[in-house]
Structures are given as structure tokens and as C-alpha cells.
UniProtKB/Swiss-Prot annotation:
GO terms for biological process: proteolysis. This is Nuclear receptor-interacting protein 3. It comes from Homo sapiens (Human). One of its GO terms (molecular function) is aspartic-type endopeptidase activity.
Amino acid sequence: MFYSGLLTEGGRKETDMREAASLRQQRRMKQAVQFIHKDSADLLPLDGLKKLGSSKDMQPHNILQRRLMETNLSKLRSGPRVPWASKTNKLNQAKSEGLKKSEEDDMILVSCQCAGKDVKALVDTGCLYNLISLACVDRLGLKEHVKSHKHEGEKLSLPRHLKVVGQIEHLVITLGSLRLDCPAAVVDDNEKNLSLGLQTLRSLKCIINLDKHRLIMGKTDKEEIPFVETVSLNEDNTSEA
């Protein structure tokens, strides 16, 4: 009986030791899991922790990434868009001004007189007709000379999609020592300009010398007209008014 009691007591101690070891092991595993997820899990709201499970998408760091992305997208959508629109408008405006400046640099202008006033005329080999804008007609006081377009049903081939609103049958232009009496189509344009078309340039036997910056007129008695500095036609002709 004595030995039996000793064996029973020894068995109990061994059982207690095993249970204690098992509890310690469970606590260590629990602490390890908590340590692994501490930095990310503590930052998550409780509803994000309820269903972590074993899925990769449901792990704390993935949930955090999704929340951050959702927050950033929400800020972008609700943030002010005016600065971006303003920046885009400025870029488009700068691009437009750059293209316009490039076109103006390619223009050939010569000094002439029309209706007793100095005008800088554009030498336009890309258009068959002489053109004068409504603004230029107004400045030169030629409104009473404007007549309705003869070929109203006929669409003239004009650059820049200009609209013909009338014509002047006898537009007197003094170019150098030459006095020209030529027709011109009146176009609806805000630019105060006058342009000499290909028909007039051919009739004057004109040669454009880009090396000397001269417009040479005539075949036998040649006359050279120097190019003038290229500036905005609107600003230049306004200053002459």
C-alpha cells in the first residue's frame, strides 16, 4: 500500500508537470503570434481583425495597404481640381502662343500705303486672292467701298478657314513706286491686316529673295522692296492707326 501511494503521487506530479509544460508552450505560441502581428494589427479597427483567417488578402498588412489606397483615392477625388485645370490651360496657352509666334516668324511683310495710310502688307503665296480684314477696312475708312461678294454661292479657297463677307473692286495700294489698282476680298477677321495674294504677285512679276530679304518686282525695270520686321499684324497696324 505504501509503494502504491508513492507511485500514485509520482504519477500525479508527472501529469502536473506535463500540463504545466503544455500551458507554457501555448502561452509562448500565443505571444509569438501577437508579436508577429502587433505592428500592423494594433493599427487596424476591430472590424478589420474579425476575419483575418489564413487568407493572404485578409492579413493585416494587406488590409492596411487597401485602406491606405482607398484613403488616397478618396482625397484625390474630393481634392480641388482647379490648380490642375489652371496648369493645363496655361500649358495649352503657352503652346498656342508658341505656334502663333512660329507662324508670325515665317511671315513676309512689306511696307505699303493704302487710303493714304501706312500699312504692312503680308506677302501670301498660299492664297490666290488679295485679302483685307473688316478691322483694316474700318481703320482705313473704306466701309463705303465694300460691296457684297459677287460669287456669293461660290466658296473661295482661303487659308485659315476665313469667311468672305464682301469685296472691294478697286483697292488702291502704293507699293514702292508702283501704284496698284486691284480687287480684294473682305474677310471677317479681328486681325487688322492686308495681304497680297498670288494673282497680284504674279502680275507684278514678283521674286521673293530670302537671302537679301527683298521683294523684287518687275522684269525689266526691277524694284526691290525690303521686308519689314515681323511683328504681330494686329499690334503693328494698331500702332499705326
